[in-house]
């Protein structure tokens, strides 16, 4: 068989993901960056595998932007598959609970 200096983990973890900070870039129609707004990680974060967050929604009056995120610290594992507090699923392999959150950002950047 020989020797190998590599290490492999073949155990599948379908709920794995890690949270990270959220940054909103404002760009012109030609693609030039205007500015970047960092969403405070003390409020919310995003999670790598989730497909239900960060869909940007503009209000009908064009004055606010909303999106869904997680009320969890950055660099936390398995948040997007965690239970919601007070709604526990005993079949969920993730043992933690985190709230989902809706973030509203005003045109001036206020959160």
Residue positions per predicted region:
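Signature of short aromatic-glycine-proline-rich micro-motifs recurring in repeat-based ectodomains
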Residues: 19-23, 42-73, 97-101
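Surface-exposed loop and turn segments in beta-propeller and other repeat-based domains
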Residues: 32-49, 107-111
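Short, conserved, GDST-rich strand-edge loop motifs in beta-rich repeat architectures
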Residues: 1-16, 68-96
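Beta-propeller domains
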Residues: 2-42
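Beta-propeller blade signature
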Residues: 20-29, 86-108
């Amino acid at each position: 068989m020989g020797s190998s200096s590599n290490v492999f983990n073949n155990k599948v973890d379908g709920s794995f993901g890690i949270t990270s900070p959220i940054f909103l870039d404002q760009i012109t129609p030609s693609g030039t960056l205007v500015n970047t707004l960092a969403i405070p990680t003390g409020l919310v974060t995003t999670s790598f595998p989730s497909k239900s967050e960060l869909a940007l929604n503009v209000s009908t009056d064009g004055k606010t932007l909303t999106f869904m995120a997680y009320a969890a610290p950055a660099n936390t594992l398995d948040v997007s598959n965690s239970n919601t507090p007070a709604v526990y699923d005993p079949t969920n392999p993730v043992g933690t609970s985190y709230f989902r959150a809706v973030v509203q950002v005003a045109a001036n950047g206020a959160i």
